[in-house]
Regions:
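Soluble FAD-dependent oxygen oxidases
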Residues: 1-265
Length: 265
């Protein structure tokens, strides 16, 4: 479903109403992007429901009642869930070869409508200031966490099990002279979201991390056991390319995150 940016407050309110009572059958992804065909700033909502179409239409009726400017409702088998096209998913991606992307992420535990509204306006200003970077997107992912919370936190290495929302901006840099300014916007986004996240410190899903550090990705409480496992199974720190658990200062200084294996002898 595609919505005008002016519908943002209504969308945030629906998301807040769902809150922590999100059915386990429901998965929501909001993507704020720029699309000239639809008047510039848009909000796409990719809503999935595991179950009958009739249940899905009832569950997503609050979104449909807002009269999206574009919508596509389909029923697909499990085998096609990742390959099926998503409305509004065209354009550049952080995973495209040769793409220069600056990603900034935050875990959220509460939904602050004022913070989301301010961030939307800042993104509109960003698109105006950096028209060559209008392939950039802001993503908000909301999944049911009832099953995640059913596992005790100290039983696994997976941190931040009570996360309500995963959000990030993927800022596309198509003009090298704008690196600093675009990264400054990303840092501002991360600070704004973290301040309204529901916790006093920054927490980031490890796969979305950049340079925040291992305590932010894995949590301080889990690091002692993780480092013990690292010393046992990877004492040479060979598997340390991306957001690793570090066990030596020397390796921390020498690791090259730009190319897998470039520092291996």
């Amino acid at each position: 479903m595609r919505f005008h940016s002016r519908d943002n407050t209504s969308l945030w309110e629906i998301m807040k109403d769902i809150g922590s009572n999100q059915p386990r059958e429901m998965a929501l992804t909001f993507q704020v992007n720029w699309n000239d065909e639809f008047g510039g700033l848009n909000i796409n909502v990719n809503a999935k429901w595991v179950g009958p179409m009739e249940e899905a239409l009832i569950a997503f009726s609050p979104f449909l009642s807002l009269n999206p400017i574009q919508r596509s409702i389909t029923q697909i088998p499990w085998t096609s869930i990742y390959s099926s096209p998503v409305l509004g998913s065209g354009g550049s991606s952080s995973c495209d070869r040769g793409t220069k992307s600056s990603n900034w992420a935050v875990n959220l535990y509460t939904i602050s409508i004022p913070a989301l509204t301010r961030t939307l306006q800042k993104l509109a200003d960003f698109y105006s200031a950096f028209p060559s970077s209008r392939t950039s997107v802001w993503s908000i992912e909301k999944f049911a966490n009832s099953v995640t919370l059913s596992t005790q936190d100290d039983e696994t290495a997976y941190p931040w099990r009570n996360t309500t929302i995963y959000t990030f901006v993927a800022l596309q840099i198509n003009d090298d002279s704008q690196d600093d300014a675009i990264n400054a916007f990303g840092a501002s986004f991360q600070a704004e979201m973290a301040a309204s996240s529901g916790y006093g410190d920054l927490r980031v899903y490890m796969n979305y991390g950049r340079d925040e550090g291992e305590e932010v990705w894995y949590s301080e409480g889990k690091l002692p056991r993780l480092k013990a496992l690292k010393r046992k199974y990877d004492p040479m720190e060979l598997f340390s390319h991306y957001n690793p658990v570090m066990i030596s200062e020397q390796h921390k200084k020498s690791v090259n995150h730009g190319r897998l294996g470039s520092d291996l002898k």
